Every structure is written in C-alpha cells, then in structure tokens.
C-alpha cells in the first residue's frame, strides 16, 4: 500500500513539474498568450492603416481633388491666376 501511495506521489510530482516548470507548461502558455495579444493589436493597426491607404489610392484613381491637394501641399504648386501668400508668425 505504501508503495502505491509513494508511486502516486512521485507521479503527481512529475505531472506538477510538467505543468509548472517545464518548457511546455503554464509559463509557455502565458508567453504565447501575450504574443498572440500583441500580434492581434499589431494586426488591427495594420488593417486600419491598409484601409486608409486603400481609400487614398481609390481617391487618387477616381478624382483629381486628391491629386490637386497633394500637388498644392507637397510640391507648393498654385493654380494659374492665383496669388500665393505665405504668413510667417513672429516668435
């Protein structure tokens, strides 16, 4: 009887070791859960960014307004007949 109890105790300790301490135990599970959460957050950010870029591409394909806006803001272009005024604020 003592042998069986001892054997069961050793078996219980071995299973507890695998659960808590081994590389495939709860520590690894927590690390994987953190990694998955971080990856999901990163994926959501990238999906949002892709939607913005897709809308911008669609706007550039379909209309001249976005193209004109980019030319004005990025290249400093003005329309014919317009006068450009630059306001400089004093420090």
From Swiss-Prot:
Coiled coil feature spans: 26-74
Transcription regulation among keywords: no
GO CC field: cell division site; cell septum; plasma membrane
Keyword Cytoplasm: no
Positions in the Cytoplasmic compartment: 1-3
GO biological process: FtsZ-dependent cytokinesis
Family: Belongs to the FtsB family.
Function: Essential cell division protein. May link together the upstream cell division proteins, which are predominantly cytoplasmic, with the downstream cell division proteins, which are predominantly periplasmic.
The protein's name in its UniProt record: Cell division protein FtsB
Organism: Nitrosococcus oceani (strain ATCC 19707 / BCRC 17464 / JCM 30415 / NCIMB 11848 / C-107)
